[in-house]
Amino acid sequence: MPTDFLFTSESVTEGHPDKIADQISDGVLDAIIAKDPQARVAVETLVKTGLAIVAGEVTTNCYVDIPKLVRSTICRIGYTDSSMGYDGNTCGVMVAIEGQSQDIARGVDNKKDQGAGDQGMMFGFACDETPELMPAPIHYAHAITRRLADVRRKQHPWIRPDGKSQVTVEYRDGRPARIDAVVVSTQHSDEVSNKKIQEAIREDVIAKALPKKLIDNKTKFFINPTGRFVVGGPMGDSGLTGRKIIVDTYGGMGRHGGGAFSGKDPSKVDRSAAYMGRHIAKTVVAAGLARRCEVQVSYAIGVAEPVSVMVETFGTATVPEERIALAVRKTFGLRPREITEYLNLLRPIYQKTAAYGHFGRTEKEFTWERVEEKKDALRDAAKSATPSGGRRLKAV
């Protein structure tokens, strides 16, 4: 990777159609897991003008009023008027849910040694570009969309729920030096002028969300570059669970295994192992073992022990990389049940993750972001680890 380059990441607001779908799916998960923590949940949502469809596989002994939950989620996001093309009070809700396959349950529902819910590879990433140990482009893109939603609720009622941001950061010698370009698109009511939109977004959103030291007279701003954005939300585009996986993670800076998070209970390693990968990578960076770290974990369906674990530090490690890999295996349990218990994942915490990123958050529910407990233990383990035969070992 070059040391001088531009890197761009995007974020979307909670009112983006795909994020509506994610929040509905995770809302269903939360409602079920609150009553039945051992439930198996895999729920997808499709939203379009006047309609929400919830489908998937659920095994539980509890009852949840899914149509009521769907409507309340849509209204909370801000779609409460038919003039927006989507109204949680009146939209149709269809539900198509069956039980989990017994073939899958046979390998997963083992109380002694719970197997992975599916095969696949998951990645975790961290770097020292921000206090949250997240890449700068996605961090600032999320800051804009969060601020946009806050301003919509508290200051400018003509802003509507759908919106996007994009931030391009210029790197010099591998470090963020300045913000080169900012793109903000926000849905709005029909009567507001373009001038008012430009001024409000520039002054009340961008200026409050981004650090002044990274903005200069060469920074480019693109605010509603098409000119108008009245038709938005599910009326403008259909929304589907799991279509914003890069927004959900590292903005493209770290790799992604392809599995979405929302609507999946912790037995699905697509979610739980990705959270654990982030926790491990963040702990590595917080412990001072590297400035940049990526962790890959892979699983076979029905098998508890991971098939492989890989640690990559991109030449930034302060101790030999193979020692970090060995220390990771010594310090962290990576079986699905160990991950679930360690991160305390059997709680209704997931709807909050479904907008503005699953990582780099400071709320108490995001246990995978807390690194103090294992930081010293990992550092000590890395210093004392002895690679077998002196050979370079990254996958164990």
From Swiss-Prot:
It comes from the Bacteria. Its cofactor is Mg(2+); K(+). ATP binds at residues 16, 162-164, 228-229, 237, 243-244, 260, 264. Its main location: cytoplasm. It holds the Pfam family S-AdoMet_synt_N. GO terms for biological process: one-carbon metabolic process; S-adenosylmethionine biosynthetic process. L-methionine binds at residues 57, 100, 237, 268. Binds 2 divalent ions per subunit. Residues 100-110 are annotated as: Flexible loop. Mg(2+) binds at residue 18. The keyword Calcium does not apply. It is an enzyme of class 2 (transferase). SUPFAM superfamilies: S-adenosylmethionine synthetase (SSF55973). Pathway: Amino-acid biosynthesis; S-adenosyl-L-methionine biosynthesis; S-adenosyl-L-methionine from L-methionine: step 1/1. K(+) binds at residue 44. It catalyses: L-methionine + ATP + H2O = S-adenosyl-L-methionine + phosphate + diphosphate. Its EC number is 2.5.1.6. GO terms for cellular component: cytoplasm. It is found in: Cytoplasm. PANTHER family: S-ADENOSYLMETHIONINE SYNTHETASE. Homotetramer; dimer of dimers. Belongs to the AdoMet synthase family. Catalyzes the formation of S-adenosylmethionine (AdoMet) from methionine and ATP. The overall synthetic reaction is composed of two sequential steps, AdoMet formation and the subsequent tripolyphosphate hydrolysis which occurs prior to release of AdoMet from the enzyme. This is S-adenosylmethionine synthase. It comes from Myxococcus xanthus (strain DK1622).
